[in-house]
């Protein structure tokens, strides 16, 4: 199945059907999943980059370690007792427990764009700064992103290497309204403060804008760089 409209093609990747309405679920709720990994066909990566992306979704504050104790035994295999009669124990290891409420819902790595200078992640600018920047958003550059040492939030991340947690497309707000209704990738008009500067944005930008408006943070890990195959791999 094929569509030349990128925004519609992305919806089709999630099994969408226009007849199911705005509250529909990816794959009609029939496919169990934990995360969606979006990969463009021109991205160059290995399994290490994939596992790094998974780790980026689980920040340190989401993880707790629970001690696992086991009885201490003597040479005869008998359980050693404490003075109070309880079993003596020793540390056998840890159980790692992840709080799903603290996982990052949308995470990405990054890649270089065809100009060889800018990257696939960007920050929003107000109208004055947008004009001063030549009518483009404040993209991280190769220089700026390489100075970053830990994950940071962005307003936009390209879909070439992006991980989305289950719930982003499924959740409802406190009023029972779908946070991210279908069509999930519909292009939108970006209108700045004066109303005189406006333009259509791409389907990935509009998804990110809608996700942020719905309360989801978008995290980029500067340590996860993947290749981008253009006239050369960058």
Place the predicted regions along the sequence by residue.
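A short beta-strand-loop structural module common to alpha/beta enzyme folds
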Residues: 1-4
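Short helix/loop segment immediately N-terminal to the Walker
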Residues: 23-31, 175-199
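Short, Asp-centered acidic motifs that coordinate Mg2+ and/or phosphate
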Residues: 35, 104-106, 218
């Amino acid at each position: 199945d094929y569509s030349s409209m990128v925004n519609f093609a992305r919806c089709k990747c999630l099994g969408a059907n226009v007849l199911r309405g705005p509250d529909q679920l990816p794959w009609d709720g029939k496919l169990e999943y934990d995360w969606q990994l979006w990969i463009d066909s021109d991205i160059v990566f290995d399994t290490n980059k994939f596992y790094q992306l998974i780790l980026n979704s689980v920040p340190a504050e989401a993880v707790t370690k629970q001690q696992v104790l086991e009885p201490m035994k003597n040479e005869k295999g008998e359980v050693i007792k404490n003075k109070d009669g309880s079993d003596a124990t020793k540390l056998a290891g840890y159980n790692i427990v992840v709080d799903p409420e603290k996982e990052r819902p949308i995470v990405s790595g990054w890649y270089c764009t065809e100009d060889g200078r800018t990257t696939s992640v960007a920050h929003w600018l107000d109208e004055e700064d947008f004009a001063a920047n030549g009518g483009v958003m404040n993209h991280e550059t190769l220089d700026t992103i390489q100075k970053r040492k830990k994950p940071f939030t962005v307003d936009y991340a390209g879909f070439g290497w992006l991980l989305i947690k289950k719930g982003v497309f499924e959740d409802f707000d406190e009023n029972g309204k779908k946070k991210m209704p279908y069509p999930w990738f519909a292009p939108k008009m970006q209108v700045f403060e004066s109303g005189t500067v406006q333009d259509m944005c791409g389907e990935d930008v509009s998804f990110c804008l809608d996700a942020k408006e719905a309360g989801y943070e978008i995290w980029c890990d500067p340590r996860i760089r993947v290749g981008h195959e253009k006239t050369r791999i960058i």
